Amino acid sequence: MSNVQGLTRSALDEDDELFVGYGFLPSIFPYRMQDLYDRSEELTPYVGVVLENQYLKALFLPELGGRLWSLYDKVAGKHLLYDNPVVRPCNLAVRNAWLAGGIEFNCGMVGHHPFTCSRIHAAETKLEDGTPVLRMYEYERIRKVVYQMDFFLPEGSKLLFARMRITNTTPYVTPIYWWSNSKK
């Protein structure tokens, strides 16, 4: 707001408010809350998928939303991401359960997406040159979109490649929000 000659005037144009709240989710339905966890330290096995070459070793956890849990630099001998030794959910996501560690990939809505602590689909495919690709994907039921994440680590590469795709399955414009986060 600005004050011009004693009058209060909005800094927004008259059409700017049309999109205030656009895409806001009043409910997480049809997903159920994930609040049946505790803060105990019991061991729980998770299935991991590894992409590795002479420079890097990447560990993904499809059971925890496809999170890149670990990225290890073999030459420097160090972890490039926050190396959390435990998986301990807490109430920070749209379905409650969220955990710290690695890189989280979020699709569909503001806030940690519905699958941050849920299993998503994982498959192996290949690039045209034969490079293995880890493909993880899921159908997000609120936005009605399919999102796909492809990761590959070619021989001789010092870079882990990520290719993301979001497909709208409806004939309508769908508000979408994509973000990733990590801590080092």
Residue spans for each PLM region:
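Acidic, contiguous internal or C-terminal segments within carbohydrate-active enzymes
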Residues: 38, 52, 58-76, 136-183
